[in-house]
Amino acid sequence: MRYLTFALTKGRLARKTLALLEQLGITCEEMKDKDSRKLIFVNEELKLKFFLAKGPDVPTYVEYGAADIGVVGKDTIMEEGREVHEVLDLRFGNCRMCVCGPKSAQELLKHRELIRVATKYPRIAKDYFYNQKHQTVEIIKLNGSIELAPLVGLAEVIVDIVETGSTLKENKLEVLEEVCPLSARMIVNPVSMRLENERIKDLISKLRALIQEA
């Protein structure tokens, strides 16, 4: 039996995924050692391997077959646009992708004015404005604090992930439109899905049952 390899998004998503898998009896004791410098963790008994990666890299590892299965946020799947199968909504890491800005920007959106949009997610923003709203905009890619853009006049609105909305309120910004809901998803390499169909489908069905019970 070959190893099934998991690429998990570092941080909270990895911890939640491992807790979920543990409920199915799938554990990896090596990963619990906080002092470990290992990059790949192995469960020899179940023939499973795990490694941690930055969110945007997870779909890349899965598309190229370096990992059979990945767990990553829906926002990353949409933004990276990789050839992977999205097989399961894990229903944690819930948040929203939204268009945000000062209240005054609402009219600009309503009348589909030519505006500037600052975001870490240019692909998602472009798809939303061009394909769903049919509004021509100038998209500005930023990497840092996106909320700053409307405050200094760089852009009229931003497209960003909203969890609690507290940062928006502190800066007198608000959610103007919701692009889509987000959560952690399981993705699978298309070739792995064919080669290991039984094992992967069994895992998906067990996880789905567990999630529905919660």
Regions picked out by a protein language model, each given a short descriptive name:
Residues 1-214:
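Domain-level signature for soluble enzymes in the chorismate/prephenate branch of the shikimate pathway
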